[in-house]
Regions:
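Active-site-adjacent loops and short helices of periplasmic peptidoglycan-processing enzymes
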Residues: 1-119, 128-130
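Domain-terminus/edge residues, biased toward the C-terminal soluble/receptor-binding domains
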Residues: 98-102, 110-198
Length: 198
C-alpha cells in the first residue's frame, strides 16, 4: 500500500460524474468556494472565498491542473464536508472492489490514513471508463483556460504516446510519482498503473 497522491482525484471525479449522471447537478451548476478551500496548498487555481466555480470548470481544473483547492470545493459542495465526502469516496471504493483503499480527503494531499494499491487504482481506472464513458473523455483534455490563465495537463503521455486517452498523474514527496494511464490501440485497451516510483 502507498499514498495515492493526486490519483485520489480520480475518485473525487467519479463521485462528480455519479452526481451528473443522476442529474443531481449539471455542468453549469455552481459550487461555492469556502475559506477552507482557498487555504489548500498548491497545486491550485487560487480561488477566492465566497466565489463560485461551475462544475465543468471544476472538472477541468482537476483533470489538467490537479487543483487541490477545487478538490476541496467539490467535496464540500457534494458531501457537506470534506471528511464526509472522503467517507463517501471510501464507500464507493469498497463497492467497486477496491478492498485496500481508504480515503481521508478529496485531493490526495498527505494523510497517513489515505492509502491505496496499484491494483485498486487500476480497478478504479477501469470502472470510471466503463461506468462513465461520456465523462471519461474529459481526461484527455490537454489544456484549459480559466480567468485568462492557461493550465496544461500534467499527463505528458497525452499527445506523445499513441493511443493515450487519459487518465491522471500524482506526486508527493511521500508517495513518489504515480500514474494511471489509459491507452487504446487496434481495438485493445490497457489501463496501466505506476505507483510510488521515486
Amino acid at each position: 500500500r502507498n499514498y495515492p497522491a493526486s490519483l485520489t482525484k480520480i475518485m473525487t471525479l467519479y463521485l462528480v460524474f455519479d452526481a451528473l449522471k443522476s442529474k443531481k447537478i449539471s455542468m453549469n451548476s455552481k459550487f461555492k468556494v469556502s475559506k477552507r478551500a482557498t487555504r489548500q496548498p498548491p497545486s491550485k487555481l487560487n480561488l477566492s472565498a465566497g466565489s463560485n466555480i461551475t462544475v465543468k470548470n471544476a472538472i477541468l481544473a482537476l483533470v489538467t491542473k490537479s487543483a487541490n483547492d477545487v478538490a476541496t470545493v467539490i467535496a464540500e459542495n457534494l458531501g457537506k464536508s470534506e471528511r464526509n465526502f472522503a467517507r463517501l469516496m471510501t464507500r464507493k471504493a469498497k463497492k467497486l472492489g477496491m478492498t485496500r483503499t481508504t480515503f481521508r480527503n478529496a485531493s490526495g494531499l498527505p494523510n497517513r490514513g489515505q492509502l491505496s494499491t496499484a491494483r485498486d487504482m487500476a480497478t478504479l481506472g477501469i470502472a470510471i471508463r466503463k461506468n462513465h464513458p461520456k465523462f471519461f473523455k474529459l481526461f484527455k483534455t490537454k489544456s484549459f483556460i480559466y480567468k485568462g490563465v492557461k493550465y496544461t495537463n500534467h499527463n505528458n503521455l497525452l499527445g506523445s504516446y499513441s493511443g493515450t486517452d487519459g487518465i491522471k498523474t500524482g506526486y508527493t514527496n511521500a508517495s513518489g510519482f504515480n500514474l494511471v494511464a489509459s491507452v487504446e490501440r487496434n481495438g485493445q485497451r490497457i489501463i496501466g498503473v505506476v505507483f510510488g516510483t521515486l
